[in-house]
Amino acid sequence: MHSRLATARLYLCTDARRERGDLADFADAALAGGVDIIQLRDKGSAGEQRFGPLEARDELAACEILADAAARHAAMFAVNDRADIARAARADVLHLGQRDLPVDVARAITGPATLIGQSTHDRDQVSAAAIGAVDYFCVGPCWPTPTKPGRTAPGLDLVRFAADVAGAKPWFAIGGIDGVRLPEVLAAGARRIVVVRAITAADDPREAAAKLKSELLAAI
C-alpha cells in the first residue's frame, strides 16, 4: 500500500452526490481519468443541505460504491474522519483533521493495513507531520475554499515550506486548486494535489482528471 501511495499524484474528495444520484458513474469517470485516491467527504455538501447528514448506513453504502470503483481502476479509496467507518468499509486510507482522533487511536481502530493521512495548516503542523506517525499529509488551503468556510488560507508559502521539510514522506497540496492554478502550485514545489470542484463540478470528470494528471506527471 505504501508503494501505491508513493506513486499517487491526484487525490479527489467527493461528496455522496445524493442530489444527483450519479456517484457510481461519476467515480468511474474520475478514476478512469487518472485519479489515484478517491475520498468520500459529505460534510457541507449540497446533499447534506437537502437531505441532512449522511447516516452511517448510507455512508457505508456510498463507501462501497467508491471502494468497488477504486478496485476496478487500481486506485485507493479513502474515508474522511471516521476510523470506525474506515474499518467497516475496509478503506485503504483514513484521512484525519487536526481535531479528529489522535493517529495512534485511529490506527488501533482501523488496523495496521490502513494508511492514515492528516491535514496541516501551519508550519508547526507540517513539521510535526513530516516526522510523525502519519503516512502522508495535506498542506493548505492554498486558496480559500467553500469546502472549508471560515478557514484562513496559508497559501503557497506553506507549500514552499512543506517542499523544504517533508523529505521522502508523501504530501499533497490542497485548497482551491484547479487547472488554472496548478502551475503555481507546481512552481511552489508540490508534486501531488487534492482537488474537489476541479473534478466534481466539471462537465466531463474524466477529461478534467486526465488534464490534471497529465500536468502532474509532466512535473515529476
Curated annotation (Swiss-Prot):
Superkingdom field: Bacteria
Record-linked SUPFAM superfamilies: Thiamin phosphate synthase (SSF51391)
A Pfam match: TMP-TENI
GO process terms (BP): thiamine biosynthetic process; thiamine diphosphate biosynthetic process
CDD domains: TMP_TenI
Keyword terms: Magnesium, Metal-binding, Thiamine biosynthesis, Transferase
Residue sites binding Mg(2+) per the record: 81, 100
InterPro entries reported for this sequence: Aldolase_TIM, ThiamineP_synth_sf, ThiamineP_synth_TenI, TMP_synthase
Gene Ontology MF terms in the entry: magnesium ion binding; thiamine-phosphate diphosphorylase activity
Binding positions (2-[(2R,5Z)-2-carboxy-4-methylthiazol-5(2H)-ylidene]ethyl phosphate): 145-147, 176
Residues in coiled coil: none
E.C. code: 2.5.1.3
Chain sites annotated for binding 4-amino-2-methyl-5-(diphosphooxymethyl)pyrimidine: 39-43, 80, 119, 148
Signal peptide coordinates: none
UniProt cofactor(s): Mg(2+)
Co-factor note (free text): Binds 1 Mg(2+) ion per subunit.
Reaction catalysis annotation: 2-[(2R,5Z)-2-carboxy-4-methylthiazol-5(2H)-ylidene]ethyl phosphate + 4-amino-2-methyl-5-(diphosphooxymethyl)pyrimidine + 2 H(+) = thiamine phosphate + CO2 + diphosphate; 2-(2-carboxy-4-methylthiazol-5-yl)ethyl phosphate + 4-amino-2-methyl-5-(diphosphooxymethyl)pyrimidine + 2 H(+) = thiamine phosphate + CO2 + diphosphate; 4-methyl-5-(2-phosphooxyethyl)-thiazole + 4-amino-2-methyl-5-(diphosphooxymethyl)pyrimidine + H(+) = thiamine phosphate + diphosphate
GO terms under cellular component: cytoplasm
Similarity section: Belongs to the thiamine-phosphate synthase family.
Function: Condenses 4-methyl-5-(beta-hydroxyethyl)thiazole monophosphate (THZ-P) and 2-methyl-4-amino-5-hydroxymethyl pyrimidine pyrophosphate (HMP-PP) to form thiamine monophosphate (TMP).
Name of the protein in its database record: Thiamine-phosphate synthase
Organism, scientific name: Mycobacterium marinum (strain ATCC BAA-535 / M)
Gene: thiE
